Amino acid sequence: GPFNLKTWELNNKIVVEKNPNYWDASMVKLNQIHYYPVSNVMTEDRMFRAGQLHVTSTLPSQKCPIYIEENNPDLRIDPYMGTYFYRLNTNNPVLEDVRVRKALAYSIDRRLLVEKVTKCGQIPAYSFTPPGSNGYQPDTSIPFDPKLAKELLNEAGYSEENSFPKLEILFNTNEDHRKVALAIQQMWQQNLGISVELVNQDWKVYLSREM
């Protein structure tokens, strides 16, 4: 590639330098790039505004609408081919029932999530294929329909007499992940009466829990 690894200080800094043997080395304008691991998005934003970082792809969600309104030249929003989603553990007998999984999906207000939680130009996704992608777009979708969600949960056998067991949302350490999880926790509680526990783990523990 255009750069070679020079140094790697764990949890401190990674330095890469220009690779003179790269096939198009004359077009590589940077001699070095320094990468800094910053776990807190507010800290990263302050470092960027103070000139300690030249580029950051992480922005506090509450700052994004302010930068958009100010037409801040430092902010660049480009299309991103990706979908934010949750995986459900179907080894759990409760979540094995497709009616339960549909109920959980129908009770999430995706438009509210992008307008009030993420707030940085995201588009509600009603299928796994990202919105606006070329090629096949499915006709079916899962809109926000709390009435249907409640009916599906009742069909699955859950009611006031037979309450739904507590669910757990596992997310890795990130303020934006926490905000999304908190919003979904509230939606499932309000629309379905389901109690949800939020569990925050650092990345390594998060991955081990998913295995």
Task: Describe each PLM feature range.
Residues 1-5, 26, 31, 62-63, ...:
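Surface-exposed, Gly/Pro/Thr- and Asp/Glu-enriched linker/hinge segments
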Residues 4, 15-18, 24, 76, ...:
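Append "and occasionally in soluble cytosolic enzymes with long acidic Gly/Pro-rich linkers
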Residues 11, 28-30, 70, 81-83, ...:
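Extracytoplasmic
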Residues 20-66, 202:
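Ligand-site clamp/hinge motif
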Residues 43-45, 53, 64, 100, ...:
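Short, hydrophobic alpha-helical packing/hinge segments within bilobed ligand-binding/sensory domains
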Residues 54-55, 187-211:
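Periplasmic binding protein-like
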Residues 65-77:
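Ligand-binding "clamshell"
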Residues 74-88, 132:
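Periplasmic-binding protein-like
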